[in-house]
Amino acid sequence: MSLMNLPEESRPREKLLALGPKSLTDAELLAIFLRTGIKGMNAIELADKLLKEFGSLRKLLGSNENEFCSHKGLGTAKFAQLQAVVEMTERYLFEKIEKEDALTSPEHTKRYLTRILRDRHREAFYVLFLDNQHRVLKGEVLFEGTIDAAAVYPREVVKRSIDYNAAAIILAHNHPSGVAEPSQADRRITKRISDAVELVDIRVLDHFVIGDGEIVSFAERGWI
């Protein structure tokens, strides 16, 4: 059935305008992005099918071009649109933490870091550089690979912190396994970085480990 044949209150776009985006299901939100369906399926039916094939909305959003375009109804134009949406989301979240104290707005910081790191297939070590009022100056992936393989160099963190004239930093990295519990290697590298930056009067305020649906804070554990 075409979306135009549905009652107006059941059409995703009209429903969003009347009740707000939170009233929509994942399939309805995706249908608005897709705009059209394929032969034999309207946009909602196609969206529902795609969500089942990918496993979740998050996995769809985190898919690469080959994965995305291998599904019927999706192509390079839609992939480009999706990447634009994802990038706008990341910039929006970064703007929110950039204008606020990263410590007094920890949920915004966690949301941003989760968005940046959660769906990466390799470990990535990310640093937020803060001024003396704990406002964000810059965020950057400094290292990629396995943290346990000594891929994180404290001297590089010190160098970048000085480059940005940072007074404090927040560390973060992901666990592709999905388990956010910090390892002993995570704790060792945190101490090494903390000791290194303290020599130039810079503080590590926290280290977040991002898993699948969970995030662990070293500061909340009392480890920093």
UniProtKB/Swiss-Prot annotation:
Q: Which PROSITE patterns would you find in this protein's record?
A: MPN, UPF0758
Q: Does the keyword Nucleotide-binding apply?
A: no
For this protein, the record's InterPro entries field holds:
MPN (IPR037518), RadC_JAB (IPR025657), RuvA_2-like (IPR010994), UPF0758 (IPR001405), UPF0758_CS (IPR020891), UPF0758_N (IPR046778)
Q: Name one GO biological process term.
A: proteolysis
Molecular function GO labels: metal ion binding; metallopeptidase activity
Which keywords does UniProt give here? Hydrolase, Metal-binding, Metalloprotease, Protease, Zinc
Query: MPN domain: from which residue to which, for each copy?
Result: 102-224
Q: Does the keyword Zinc apply?
A: yes
Q: Which residues form a coiled coil?
A: none
Positions annotated to bind Zn(2+): 173, 175, 186
Report the residue ranges where the short sequence motif JAMM motif is annotated in this entry.
Answer: 173-186
| Family to which the UniProt record says this protein belongs | Belongs to the UPF0758 family.
Tell me the PANTHER family matching this sequence: DNA REPAIR PROTEIN RADC, UPF0758 PROTEIN YEES-RELATED
Protein name, UniProt field: UPF0758 protein VSAL_I0192
